[in-house]
Design a protein with these regions (language model features):
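Acidic/polar active-site rim loop that often engages polyanionic ligands
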Residues: 126-132
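Active-site pocket-lining/capping segments in soluble small-molecule metabolic enzymes
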Residues: 1-118, 122, 126, 137-293
Length: 293
């Protein structure tokens, strides 16, 4: 089993991003994803910056994957996507079907990211024909659903053709919209957002009228209010055939989580979830914000 550090989903200053990935070079992750997946206006790092950063990380011996945008809204964004896909050095995580098609046209293998709506065996087969070699399960699906689908893949003799990766810690990316919720929360138009996302390095918290934290606003992305945590499921995931466990790169705590998750393989330990900040409901096919201890 391998461990991955998912792409940072938030908007940070360039120096903070570079410092974070300098630390990532010596972390427990076998695979490091990086790149802008949420908003093309987040230009603290341009394409050459991301690729140069990827080259530096690759020197540490880790597999580097460039993650692409989840919602493409212009011809310019498609052109940028094509440049990433044609980088010539690094694998790509496709988070939109346009990326899947471009990579198929280029005859390049790819990772199907969690934003790709792949819920059944038929879709898995389509993605495999397109060139997928690793599939990241959509975050809202359950352990039982995953076990069933992997079993179906085994029975269809395609299971050995792809790796399975599960988002296992961090704020869950739940939905995407052409509207920018962070800008709206500051009474700004999207076209005049003044890059306000950078003021919320872990997103902007959103509470219900009852005062319960339900979501995290991150630009056009709506995330879970609590951090998803499957630390007690590492060995169960291994047993059903998960190949890669993903830790989201949302702050320096991610490095501690990588160590903690990896240690579960050698010496399993039970960690009760924090009732105020963590959740794991989706894994048990119940409300995502629920906590099962």
């Amino acid at each position: 089993m391998q461990f991955s550090l998912g792409a940072n989903l938030f908007f940070w200053p360039k120096t903070q991003v570079e410092t974070f990935y300098q630390q990532a070079m010596t972390c427990e992750a076998d695979i490091i994803y990086l790149g802008e997946t949420v908003c093309s206006k987040r230009r603290e790092l341009r394409i050459h910056d991301w690729l140069n950063l990827a080259k530096e990380i690759a020197k540490s011996g880790k597999q580097v994957v460039i993650s692409t945008m989840t919602l493409l809204e212009s011809a310019a964004e498609i052109q940028t996507l094509k440049k990433y896909c044609a980088n010539g050095d690094f694998l790509i995580e496709a988070n939109d079907l346009s990326a899947v098609q471009i990579l198929h046209d280029y005859q390049l293998p790819f990772v199907a990211g969690p934003a790709i709506n792949c819920y059944n065996l038929s879709t898995l087969k389509v993605l495999l024909k397109q060139g997928m070699f690793r599939w990241v399960m959509p975050v809202e699906l359950s352990k039982d659903w995953l076990a069933s689908l992997l079993s179906q893949a085994q029975q269809s003799s395609i299971r050995q053709q792809f790796e399975c990766e599960v988002f296992s810690w961090g704020y869950l990316p739940l939905a995407y919209s052409a509207r920018c919720f962070t800008a709206r929360s500051e009474n700004r138009a999207k076209d005049d957002c003044q890059y306000c996302c950078i003021n919320y390095p872990q997103g902007r918290k959103m509470k219900s009228q009852e005062g319960e934290q339900v979501f995290t606003l991150n630009g056009i992305q709506t995330m879970s209010g609590d951090q998803y945590n499957l630390v007690n499921e590492v060995n169960n995931m291994q047993a059903i055939g998960v190949d890669v466990i993903r830790i989201s790169a949302d702050n320096n705590q991610a490095f501690d989580k990588l160590r903690q998750f990896k240690q579960q393989l050698a010496s399993p330990q039970y960690f009760p979830l924090d009732k105020n900040t963590e959740c794991n409901g989706y894994w048990y096919q119940i409300a995502g914000m629920a906590k099962v201890n």
